C-alpha cells in the first residue's frame, strides 16, 4: 500500500507557526496497529488519516498514543491537503467521523468549519476534581468534557 503523508501547520500563515498535524491520504484503512505506529512515528500532536468514500471522506485522528474522537486542527489540515494537493474541485468537503459529519468550506478568507454541537447539561464535578480546584466554579456543564463557568477571569 502506498502511503502519502504531509505535515501541515494549522491556524497560521507562517512557517513553523500554528498547530502541527500530519495528514495521511490512504485508499483504505489498514489495521489500527499500523495507524497507531504511523502516528507514533510522526510524533506530532495529531495524525489525521483520510480515506475517500464516494462524495465523502472518512477521517480518523491519532495522537502518538491513542485514537481521538475529534480534532479541529487536524481536520482543517486534512481539508487543506485535499483542496491543495488532490485536484478536488468542489468548495465543500464532508468528512465522516466517529463524532458525526464535519464540513469544511473553502471561502475567500480561507476555510470555514462546521462541527456537531456537543451541548452540555448542567452537572456537578466529581468530588476529587472539585476539591482540587483552588477557585470553585459558579456553574458546571458536562458533555464529553466539563465546562466550568466562573464569575470573573483570574
Place the predicted regions along the sequence by residue.
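Active-site proximal loop and beta-alpha junction motif in alpha/beta enzyme cores
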Residues: 1-70, 76-154
Amino acid at each position: 500500500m502506498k502511503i502519502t503523508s504531509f505535515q501541515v501547520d494549522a491556524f497560521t500563515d507562517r512557517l513553523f507557526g500554528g498547530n502541527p498535524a500530519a495528514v495521511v491520504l490512504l485508499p483504505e484503512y489498514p489495521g489500527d496497529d499500523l495507524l497507531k505506529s504511523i502516528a507514533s512515528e510522526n510524533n506530532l500532536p495529531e495524525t489525521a488519516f483520510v480515506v475517500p468514500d464516494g462524495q465523502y471522506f472518512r477521517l480518523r485522528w491519532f495522537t502518538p498514543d491513542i485514537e481521538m474522537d475529534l480534532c479541529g486542527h487536524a481536520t482543517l489540515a486534512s481539508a487543506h491537503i485535499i483542496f491543495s494537493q488532490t485536484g478536488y474541485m468542489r468548495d465543500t468537503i464532508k468528512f465522516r467521523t466517529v463524532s458525526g459529519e464535519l464540513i469544511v468550506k473553502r471561502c475567500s478568507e480561507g476555510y470555514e468549519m462546521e462541527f456537531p454541537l456537543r451541548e452540555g447539561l448542567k452537572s456537578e464535578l466529581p468530588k476529587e476534581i472539585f476539591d482540587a480546584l483552588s477557585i470553585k466554579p459558579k456553574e458546571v456543564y458536562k458533555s464529553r468534557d466539563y465546562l466550568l463557568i466562573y464569575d470573573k477571569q483570574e
